[in-house]
Amino acid sequence: MLLNMNLQELKQKYNYDVATKMMQQYLDIKFAHLDCLLLFRMGDFYEMFYEDAILASNVLGIALTKRGKNGEEEIAMCGVPYHALENYLTKLIEENYKVAICDQLETPEEAKNRGGYKAVVTRDVTRIITPGTIIEENLIASAEPNYLASLVIPKNKETASLCYVDLSTSEIVVVNVPETEILNELARLKPREILLSENLRSSNLADSIFKQLNFRITYQVDSFFAINKCKKIILDFYKMKDIKGIGEISSSQICAIGSVLEYLSLTQKQNIPHLPIPRIINFHSYMTIDFSTRRNLEIVTNSQGDSQGSLLSTLNHTVTKQGGRLLYNFLSSPLTNIAKINHRLNITEFFYSNLEIVKKIRELLKKTSDIERCLTRITMNRSSGRDLLSIKYTLETATIIKEVFFDAYGFNLPDFIEKIIKPLSGDAELYNLIDETIREDAPNNLNDGGIIKHEYHPKVAQLHDLINNGKLYIEKLKDQYRKETGIDSLKISHNNVIGLFIDITAKNVNKILDPKFIHRQTTVNHVRYTTAELQKLESELVNAKTLVISLEKELYADICSQVIEKASYLRMLASSLSGLDVFCNFAYIADEYDYVKPEFTDDLSFDIVKGRHPVVEKALQRESKSFVYNDCHLSELERIWLITGPNMAGKSTFLRQNAIIAIIAQIGSFVPAKSAKIGVVDKIFSRIGAADDLIKGQSTFMAEMLETSAILAQSTKNSLIILDEVGRGTSTYDGVSIAWSVLEYIHDKLKCRCLFATHYHELTVMSNFLPALQNYTIAIEESGKDILFLHNIISGAADRSYGLHVAALAGLPESVINRAEQILLKFEKTSTGKGKNILSTESNNLSLFYLEPNKTTISSKLDKKFSTIDPDKLSPKEALELIYELKKLV
């Protein structure tokens, strides 16, 4: 509502003309930031007023009070202590509020000196905090990026441009994305905030981003993305004369980069970050994993959105924050280039072959700091002495890490390792700068003082000496004056009216002969004096704290500017340390969990021997149980495995396991298997599980069909598709028909690798006429009414699903199970002979499913039946029933 008002209407609503000067100042700033919650600094508190106060009180759970009246209207107010601001910001950001921080730009004393005792302290917004522009450690996850993204859709709509930046680490990237892959790319990045043109507010894209991905969108007017404006912003930001300095980029990429930089400028005010030139990447360099597949495979989060139980949590044994973020990025973006994959695998293999080095490096890495985020805080004037000390300690540790390599290999390191550790040599100039200037006990807050070493600057030493030894200097001056006057009872005292003064008894007044003693006050029994020397000392003592803090801030800013000059090197060092952490992590888990180096080919191989699901395996190990490994042998000649078998037997685990092995392999890690030979996978798609999407008004079946449709539309020959129970949620005939046609399409049109699990046993006959499709099932052992799931994948087809056994295991009442057995028996009797012939009996009307009778299958069934018959033990009635049964088989 407020956003739709003009300035005059706003002033009228809030009785602006009769408001106090301070409240007018608040309203002026609020009117300029109507889309934000305004936190207004007043002394030791950040206050909120009017509607902001009511909203913040509810969200933060803090008391709502009043600050007098504005005209006839009472002013609602609430506040939070300035030192606890981050705690409250966390809640506001989690609730997706945009927060404007309004600070005091001068002290009350400075305001009085400027405009008298009625002067209002100057205030202004120093930054606007949004989910995508956070840099505070306490407000963002340490082990994952915090992206702000700008999405620009050109008029042809074939290719979109996406620029994303992590302000906390100064990473900035731009990429062109096919229009059909926009949601998948956003799912990969998981940006905290997306900038989008107002013209797209009602588009299907915006609807999908919000409803399917649940990402925050910040809309901007269309002119925000104007090409000429964005080009100028880029040139000014990077101090370039030609846009080609960025590289070969399209017009829409210019708009994406420029709009991101403009948004950072608007939110960060004067503290614009020092960002490197945007890195231009190729969308096809990374494996495509759509948002539903990421959810189904639980790659970086589990189904509830937490990291616990995800693939990331299983593989993450990194020991640094930046290493954790790099692993997160690796898992989100598996490679598709064989050379780059093998390069990573060679690094992993080197460390796997040098586990003693790995052990030493991991211990040393624990002593390093997150210098990426330290550097960002320094460049944005939000750092503390602790950040500089963190850089110093990390530089020191980096050189020790390099010595570990040198001690083991001398100058004979492989080139790919030498390249990683090159930045570890350190920077003596930078190290010495910090070592000589910053105290080891430097506080977090610059306003506390005590950051700069005393010996670095003589004035700092002098001021601290005054602060620490002020009383001693007063005592020395007192002793001096006693000697000069001969008055042993002379004292130097203090009160709030005249400050420091020399105090003597009235009877000694005749001894004060030197004119330097200036009379200040006479009481009944005492006379008080001062001197120029005492006044100077008093002034120095009173101002020492303020002066030293001001001087230290000035010196600190100069030191930070020198550190910023080393930003490129520090980013390389951070990259080196995070890379070491990730590859040592890969070597560690390969050794700890018996992983093997995969081999990559350029064909359709997917040959996994004794593969395991890493997450399930780890969960079973906690229960002292073993995981049952399985093979998977897909190839050009056997591209599709049709898997049938009982519920709870492990079909879904097997499907997920192989998709996960492909992902792990293509990030450069060893994999949970005895051996693995993989043709590079360009895209992974999964259709696993069932859930109604009530928010979008979609049934389970509709959601499934939409996902399946997207898979068939986007897959290529090099993709890996895993499908579980396609076609359920509708009638049996409809479901079988859909599953059948999907399988045919994958086999004949896409010709890609596919694992297809189903309870439609009718589909198994497709192996008779689809040469690249083979039947597999899950081995079980039956003992009377009991079954044992062996979890082994074996060649063949299941003829039943054992649903009643699973129902019994789930605890259904025995009477229900018994009744279900009776009904099942009746169904089986009335449908004997129809089961796998349902489709073929309809074949005259549906040519899609027309099958030639399979004599081999019939013969095998007859053989199986005859092998169980003992003619000598058949009664006449049993023999007659057998004849009818055999006739149905034929």
From Swiss-Prot:
Keywords: ATP-binding, DNA damage, DNA repair, DNA-binding, Nucleotide-binding. ATP binds at residues 645-652. CDD domains: ABC_MutS1 (cd03284). SMART domains: MUTSac, MUTSd. It holds the Pfam family MutS_II. GO terms for molecular function: ATP binding; ATP-dependent DNA damage sensor activity; damaged DNA binding; mismatched DNA binding. Gene3D superfamilies: 1.10.1420.10, 6.10.140.430, DNA repair protein MutS, domain I, MutS, connector domain, P-loop containing nucleotide triphosphate hydrolases. This protein is involved in the repair of mismatches in DNA. It is possible that it carries out the mismatch recognition step. This protein has a weak ATPase activity. Belongs to the DNA mismatch repair MutS family. PANTHER family: DNA MISMATCH REPAIR PROTEIN MSH1, MITOCHONDRIAL (PTHR11361:SF34), DNA MISMATCH REPAIR PROTEIN MUTS FAMILY MEMBER (PTHR11361). This is DNA mismatch repair protein MutS. It comes from Rickettsia rickettsii (strain Iowa). The gene is mutS.
